[in-house]
Amino acid sequence: MRIMLLFTAILAFSLAQSFGAVCKEPQEEVVPGGGRSKRDPDLYQLLQRLFKSHSSLEGLLKALSQASTDPKESTSPEKRDMHDFFVGLMGKRSVQPDSPTDVNQENVPSFGILKYPPRAE
């Protein structure tokens, strides 16, 4: 969860830096005819997107902070199934205190005693 929070912070800083660099440019260019240049509508749309993304970014940060405060309750059955699947692939089993694993040695197949041929030197 910390990785997700770190990624969000880096994303927020990079967005703020990129939009900050755009806003530092001159906002209004005067055309000799007394009108405004064609960049003004684009700048207006860019500022609108910045404002909309700021509010959605706040919502994203709120959701991430709520998720990071209580990570144990947010585990879904799908996530648990995927965890069990990968643990099974790796061959590692965690012993749960409520489910002991007793292995009966009689039921375990064995290859018997391995005999090596005498060394020929």
From Swiss-Prot:
InterPro entries the record matches: Neurokinin-B/TAC3 (IPR003635), Tachy_Neuro_lke_CS (IPR013055)
Propeptide: 17-78, 94-121
Signal peptide residue numbers: 1-16
Primary location group: secreted
Ranges annotated as biased composition (Polar residues): 96-108
Disordered as annotated region, ranges: 93-121
PROSITE patterns: TACHYKININ (PS00267)
Protein name: Tachykinin-3
Pfam families: Neurokinin_B
Example GO biological process: positive regulation of blood pressure
Record's keyword terms, sorted: Amidation, Cleavage on pair of basic residues, Disease variant, Hypogonadotropic hypogonadism, Neuropeptide, Secreted, Signal
Lineage: Eukaryota, Metazoa, Chordata, Craniata, Vertebrata
Record localization: Secreted
Family: Belongs to the tachykinin family.
Record disease entry: Hypogonadotropic hypogonadism 10 with or without anosmia: A disorder characterized by absent or incomplete sexual maturation by the age of 18 years, in conjunction with low levels of circulating gonadotropins and testosterone and no other abnormalities of the hypothalamic-pituitary axis. In some cases, it is associated with non-reproductive phenotypes, such as anosmia, cleft palate, and sensorineural hearing loss. Anosmia or hyposmia is related to the absence or hypoplasia of the olfactory bulbs and tracts.
Residues the record lists as Methionine amide modifications: M90
Any one GO molecular-function label of the UniProt entry: signaling receptor binding
Cellular component, GO, one term: extracellular region
Superkingdom: Eukaryota
Record annotation: effect of changing R80S: In HH10; phenotype consistent with normosmic idiopathic hypogonadotropic hypogonadism; the patient also carries a mutation in HS6ST1
Function: Tachykinins are active peptides which excite neurons, evoke behavioral responses, are potent vasodilators and secretagogues, and contract (directly or indirectly) many smooth muscles. Is a critical central regulator of gonadal function.
